Amino acid sequence: PNHLVTLPMQLLTPQWLLCLNHTTEVLENQAVLINQDLIQAIGPREEMLLAHPGAERVDLPGQVLMPGLINCHTHAAMNLLRGAADDLALHDWLQTRIWPLEGELADAEFVYDGTVLAAAEMLQGGITTFNDMYFYPDQVVQAALDVGSRVFAGITVIEFPTRYAAEAKQYIELGIAARDKFKHENTVHWTIAPHAPYTVSDDTFRHMAMLAEELDLPVHCHLHETASEVSDAESRDGIRPFARFEQLGLINERLMAVHGVHLNEHELQAMAAKGATLVHCPASNLKLASGIAPVAAALKAGVNVVIGTDGAASNNKLDLWEEGRLASLLCKGASGDATAFPAGQLLMSMTCNAAKALGAEDLIGRIAPGLQADLIAVAVGEAAHQLPNHNLISKLAYSGASRDVKHVWVAGVQVVQSQQLVGQRAQLVGEIMRKTQRVWQTRVEKVG
């Protein structure tokens, strides 16, 4: 594991430092000292250089150093299904394309290979942590470790048989076994991940809620994604899925409710009061014509709103810069309030607020002593589209781009240097890319 390798101290000297320590203050002439996997100190550049002459100096001129981005909802392995199911509404997308494809193809090898590609795409775009929900979480984790990303893997349950498991009990047992297997890895974390109200029973939800309490983990679940999910539940159960979640005791600070496109004012108030999080995935919601989540109302109610890309089969990119920009612009346009979801709040929703949602506030999402060194250096003065720089926060929020991310560190290890994956990672990703063109493309088309 990474953390057993001793790394030299690294002293990073960026032109600008954006700590996002629940504030959007931009500092200049600062240095950040990394010791092993941790941020050890932050201070004035000259003082730090004198105090740590032995540290390996990494000069970052024309760049801003900031916390790595946190993608709060994805299905990484679905990178192999990118472009396999387009221009369909959610129900048709799942029933006619995705579930049949997964039934045929989604084995351990599929999950490993797809997650390797996704982790590479995300790291190169400045995403250092992804919150995943998929089958074979042991493979998800192995892929993340091999590429160098931090991962929150889901102990996923969907109550129908797949290649991975037959019924709820087995899904849970396999998930717990995977968690035990990787318990010594400092970049591997877990969530309890029931798929959705329409694929998981009350008994299983109750059991998973208990498990989340017992293991102190977040609960990661799709909720109110489409209008039909809500109306079907009303005619079937006489109650909206959200109210059912309330009865089951799921609406609390552990809950990361994904999509929430069809949440009403009362439900948003309840989420805010209980400290639940809304994970907003605007591109997927637009592409599947699910609608536009009530983000302005959620923020006004005091709900913690964070951002996810969803999987590449419904986005079709894993680009958090683009996702965040879309989230903010949609929020303004849909609410008629140009001040809604401002730049600073957007950047925090992809860093410190995302960490809070994952119960990892003291671990990631900010640049502060004692936190994990998950950092990205973003070029802000090298290309025409990056200038001028009189408002860095606005620049990053509204015109920041994956192609501007130069260097990436995860747990103190530099995994991307000058936009390229470092070391063995590049070879691994190259191999899987070739295999995808040779093997997976054909297999996906065959099921087609």
Which residues does each predicted region cover?
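His/Asp/Glu-enriched, well-ordered alpha-helical/loop segment
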Residues: Q247-R254, A296-E382
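Active-site microenvironment of metallo-dependent hydrolases
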Residues: N2-Q30, I34-Q40, R45, A51, ...
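Divalent metal-coordination and catalytic microenvironments
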Residues: Q15, V32, D37, G62, ...
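Alpha-helical scaffold segments that flank or form the walls of functional sites
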Residues: R82-G148, Y171-H184, M433-Q437, E445
